[in-house]
Amino acid sequence: MDYYETGKYVFVHGWIPCTQWEEGINMFGEKISNYDPLPDWRTGNWDKASWLNGMDCWNKNIRIKDKIILCGHYHSSWGHCFIHKQGIDIPKTYDDINENWHTEPFVDDGIICLDACTVLSGKVNCWKIDKQKKININKENKDD
């Protein structure tokens, strides 16, 4: 299954299919991607879409009108750092894991990114969808 769609939500791993093209290289030597929407995202290339940074795509206007996309794959701290300008992206050392590293869900208009970078944070983000209200649960497993 490539995605699951309800009336209000679309659940994906990375993001919805779109056309990705390289725009250049940033100061860290990383590729800068840009994206163009597809006429019908449902029939696009899901092999590629599964590995996209959904927050980057969302920030570059790859969205679904009147839907909220729940994604993972890429750590939510990226969105907090580079889009919301809060905290750090990824800690360079274990000593950098502190309150400045935001691993809670990245939430904005049309997106909920749940990836907590569990391997480093020890946290798993969950999002309960209720017809009456939304409840965010961020549970840290301190025993394992």
Regions found by a protein language model. Name each.
Residues 119-126, 135, 141-142:
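C-terminal regions of proteins
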